């Protein structure tokens, strides 16, 4: 099975280590452009742009990077309750047209009650999912060209319509991740691709089976994706050393404060991530080559695949055999690690790469010449 592999734009910060300013890197537009252009050239299908008050606005970041990339798709956040579904549909159609069909949308209900209250959204977990279902029903229908009247518990619109349609028909695909029962119900009814964070394969298989069954009851099929960090090196020993270095400057106080902050979230997915490590740096390999160290201080995706190229590829294929066809990867720092993933992991996978533009030329497609006129020895193909 051909796999779609995305990268990640770290609009909330980047660096060599977690939980410290040592080795930290300023993230400005120039740096984000470097990462996006690297992902574009290396053959990643797209980039996920995060959302929330700790991040730059995902829509504006995507719009700023469209002109400097050629094939890369941008997965940006839809925020039910923060914006009207009709306005969001107009924005989505515009971004899709301006990007020449490179816009994808990620439904984000939110999981931090404090942040949501600051944004003016005062709904419980259950109410947020009710509102998200209403939002998505309207957003989809408006983008597909309908004139919509809708009277819901949380959202009411009359005569909602779109004058300028999206380029992708009937509309751009909708992605969504959530681990609660309500999230799975929403995914089964409304989205094209259901995302999970990187839990052990058995747990992921269970979630896929649940969503697949719920979707089948509605006469639908849903694709599946997974969000993971990757630490890949030429040898497994080097990869595990890199994992250890990533948290080398983390002290127990920083871990405790991070976990206390994340504990206020009402996100079931966040709770499942935290349960993998229990706030302790002991026994972080929670499944073969699946390392939970990132989640000690990072919210959201908190696990990484660790190993050499063939080993990480084998773990990727294990997830693919469960039905996952889309992998959203990241690594610290994101510029350098995009090259490592492309050079050390891609050769061992059947990667679905965007088509190269016609007429693209290469100065040296083979690496640096030997003694100025001898082609380098061809590497063995795996």
UniProtKB/Swiss-Prot annotation:
EC numbers on record: 1.14.14.5
MF annotations from Gene Ontology: alkanesulfonate monooxygenase activity
Induction / repression: Repressed by sulfate, cysteine, or thiocyanate.
Reactions performed catalytically: an alkanesulfonate + FMNH2 + O2 = an aldehyde + FMN + sulfite + H2O + 2 H(+)
Coiled-coil blocks: none
EC top class named in words: oxidoreductase
Biological process terms in GO annotation: alkanesulfonate catabolic process
InterPro entries according to UniProt: Alkanesulphonate_mOase_FMN-dep, Luciferase-like_dom, Luciferase-like_sf, SsuD_RutA_monooxygenase
Keyword Flavoprotein tagged: yes
Keywords: Flavoprotein, FMN, Monooxygenase, Oxidoreductase
Pfam families: Bac_luciferase
NCBIfam families in the record: alk_sulf_monoox, PRK00719.1
UniProt family annotation: Belongs to the SsuD family.
Additional information: FMNH(2) which is absolutely required for this enzymatic reaction, is provided by SsuE.
General function of this protein: Catalyzes the desulfonation of aliphatic sulfonates.
Official protein name in the record: Alkanesulfonate monooxygenase
Lineage start: Bacteria, Pseudomonadati, Pseudomonadota, Gammaproteobacteria, Pseudomonadales
């Amino acid at each position: 099975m051909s796999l779609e592999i995305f990268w990640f734009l770290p609009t909330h910060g980047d660096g060599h280590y977690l939980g410290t300013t040592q080795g930290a890197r300023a993230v400005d537009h120039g740096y984000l452009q470097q990462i996006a252009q690297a992902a574009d050239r290396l053959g990643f299908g797209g980039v996920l742009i995060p959302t929330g008050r700790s991040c730059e606005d995902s829509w504006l970041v995507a719009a700023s990077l469209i002109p400097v990339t050629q094939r890369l798709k941008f997965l940006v956040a839809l925020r039910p309750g923060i914006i009207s579904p009709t306005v969001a549909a107009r924005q989505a159609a515009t971004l899709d047209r301006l990007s020449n069909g490179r816009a994808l949308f990620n439904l984000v209900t939110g999981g931090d009650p404090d942040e949501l209250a600051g944004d003016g959204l005062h709904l419980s977990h259950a109410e947020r999912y009710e509102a998200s279902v209403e939002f998505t029903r309207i957003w989809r229908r408006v983008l597909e060209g309908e004139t919509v009247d809708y009277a819901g518990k949380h959202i009411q619109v009359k005569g909602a319509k779109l004058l300028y349609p999206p380029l992708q028909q009937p509309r751009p695909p909708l992605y969504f991740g959530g681990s609660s029962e309500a999230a799975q119900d929403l995914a089964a009814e409304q989205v094209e691709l259901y995302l999970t964070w990187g839990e052990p394969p058995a747990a992921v298989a269970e979630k896929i089976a649940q969503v697949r069954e719920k979707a089948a009851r509605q006469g639908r099929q849903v694709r599946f994706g997974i969000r993971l960090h990757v630490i890949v090196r030429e040898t497994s020993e080097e990869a595990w050393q890199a994992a250890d270095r990533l948290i080398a400057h983390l002290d127990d106080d920083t871990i405790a404060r991070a976990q206390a902050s994340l504990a206020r979230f009402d996100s079931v997915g966040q709770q499942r991530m935290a349960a993998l490590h229990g706030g302790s740096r002991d026994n972080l390999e929670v499944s073969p080559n699946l390392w939970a160290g990132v989640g000690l201080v990072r919210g959201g995706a908190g696990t990484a695949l660790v190993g050499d190229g063939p080993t990480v590829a084998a773990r990727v294929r294990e997830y693919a055999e469960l039905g996952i066809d889309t992998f959203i990867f990241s690594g610290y720092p994101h510029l350098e690690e995009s090259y490592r993933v492309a050079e050390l992991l891609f050769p061992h996978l059947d990667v679905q790469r965007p088509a190269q533009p016609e007429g693209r030329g290469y100065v040296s497609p083979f690496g640096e010449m030997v003694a100025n006129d001898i082609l380098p020895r061809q590497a063995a193909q795996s």
